[in-house]
UniProtKB/Swiss-Prot annotation:
It comes from Psychromonas ingrahamii (strain DSM 17664 / CCUG 51855 / 37). Its EC number is 2.7.1.167, 2.7.7.70. One of its GO terms (molecular function) is phosphotransferase activity, alcohol group as acceptor. SUPFAM superfamilies: Nucleotidylyl transferase, Ribokinase-like. It comes from the Bacteria. This is Bifunctional protein HldE. It is an enzyme of class 2 (transferase). One of its GO terms (cellular component) is cytosol.
Amino acid sequence: MKITLPEYDKAQVLVVGDVMLDRYWHGPTARISPEAPVPVVKVEQIEERPGGAANVALNVAALGGKVNLIGLVGDDEAANVLVKNLKSVHVNTDFVSVPNFPTITKLRVLSRHQQLLRLDFEEGFEGIDSTDILEKMHASLTRQPSVVILSDYNKGSLADVQKMIQLAKKFNSVVLVDPKGSEFEKYRGATLLTPNLAEFEAVVGKCHSEKELVERGLALIKELDLDALLVTRSEHGMTLLREGQEPLHLPTQAQEVYDVTGAGDTVISVLASSLAAGSSFEQACTLANAAAGVVVGKIGTSTVNTIELANAVYSQQEIGFGVLSEEQLKLAVKLAQHRGEKVVMTNGCFDILHAGHVSYLNTAREQGNRLIVAVNSDQSVRNLKGQGRPVNPVDRRMAVLAGLGAVDWVIEFTEETPQRLIAEILPDLLVKGGDYLPEDIAGGKEVIANGGEVRVLQFEEGCSTSEIIKTIRNNS
């Protein structure tokens, strides 16, 4: 199965669930307290990170998706910290503030990357009326988020989870649930559940073989009227189950495991973002599995960005080639540059590909390790060359260019010049054929300002698209 990272900036996700604040106190330990047989930690660093459903939303935003977060908080300093931190990373918060209840906060004390103690500040929101959350959900769903995540830590925000599932389904949203506890009946009708193995076996019983896990998982799908079930299995990876389809077993991609805190949040957020951006279930689960392998190598609740995810998915393999969207190309370029590869970019109409074009593109590719060709849209060619051009529409021109061995990536631009696109991509080297001065080449100033270089290459004499068209017309 070929995996391509989707355009996460197109994903719209609504997260509803138990919001928390994770606090971390870091410091060295050099002695034992004279008051009790416990280590003394000299606190030198304090971190505050969104946790629980807030960490799920943070993970969606880290991939570039648009996310709205709904949950219960107290009227306190911890809630203000959460709102401020989430706003800074473009997470839209729509919290329900509950007087006389503290925002759920977990304080961890660490020394030399080892957790020594955790203190929980919470009363739990059990029994709180869900009307306000349901109203906020309805308002958010009218803005058409394509995927809804229900992040359940059994703290009370999802007390009426069945009503939430039915509300989301009225808007034809995909509903993903990260469950808690052994009462899975309340999640009936969701699109997909993501229990870990312990949670899954607490519901269906101990599974002694792969066959048993699959059979019981499929039975659970039927019983709860689900579309799919994704069982996360720690060092054994994860398994995607769907009725009438073969199970998909994905081995773990974790290289080192430092902390599993928040790994489940990362899985469901990448899964949701990928589905919202157009990935299939298989592709979305593969990406979520890769992301989990990255995040467990970090300390505490954390996120995975597109570069880390691309590295995990592609490793030392090719990121892919051919015709890409702008977001896909930006990711491909960042990953190539991250590996130390030199990215070259050029542009043109390339209406009827001829020997001069091929020679020029080969020379351009020799200047670096990767070659991008930006191609004028049909209207752009028409504006430059006049009526009757292009002879070949842009999809055919790009397909031919993508088939050349010298070319890695091809992209269309619709403006008169590719200046905006080049400024977004920022290749290491920008090349152009003809009698240009480097400072006059569109996008050149931006490339140079970024530390790149601009070069002018020579076209092969005697080759011209206009002359080819003239010859064809004269002979017809």
